[in-house]
Amino acid sequence: GDAQDSATVDVLRQFLTEMRPMLEAIDSTSGQGDVLRRETEALLDGLKRHQALFPEDPVPDVVWMPSGFNFALYPTPTCLAVGLDWFMGPTQPLLEELPPSQFPQYRLNRMKPEWMASDAMKGWLLVTHQHRIPPGARTADLMLFWGQIMHLTSLYMPNATPAQLLNWTSEEWAWAEANERAIWAQVQPQERMFNDNPREVMRWFQEGPFTRVGDIPQESPDKLGAYLGWKMVQAHTAARGDLPVDGWFMAQDPQPFLRTYRP
């Protein structure tokens, strides 16, 4: 409304009153000067590495902002907005007021300030390359896509641990490493590897407390399809040491990657 209208002023005052606790929480956590400097430097370094490998791609402007818990990341080809309220730390008291149906404990546990840059880098790559996912994508297709994204993110964010890049704890990463062959045995059957039922395929890649597929136990971490895809891409690039980045990152046929992966 009109800036001179008293009703408009009242609405703005109400908005500021409602936002104040969130802004104060951000200022003491993810929005602290040293935290933002550290995460900005890491993210910009990652984007510079991307530009060196893919000079034709536009580099997005990075915007740190409160989102009102509407989004953690809002990536476009030219802008990468990061919701600071999603990275205030899992022990921030304000998070206790969020509805558990939308913010379950596993999601709260991942709201770490030190994950802002790596989450933003990975999220930007996922969104800007999602057009490469083929229609009727099979489990194998999404394993390749996620593996490519994870491997490229790891090159751009060399100081991030593998567990961090998957939004896992170190214990969850250790579990996956110890059970890699058993996980592979669950996805290897043709009816799972080349399944194109979206609901069944996404069980391997969606966020959750664990991976809800077959005989995989509840102590497993989520997104085990992304984990196996990453392992698959790592195995392929190791076997093809002369392969340039665009040679494996832009590939869309999972078969050569499946052939070189032997857990």
Predicted regions and their residues:
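N-terminal, post-signal-peptide region of Sec/Tat-exported proteins
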Residues: 1-7
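Acidic/His-rich structured neighborhood in mature extracellular/periplasmic domains
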Residues: 9-173
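A cross-kingdom marker for long, charged
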Residues: 140-263
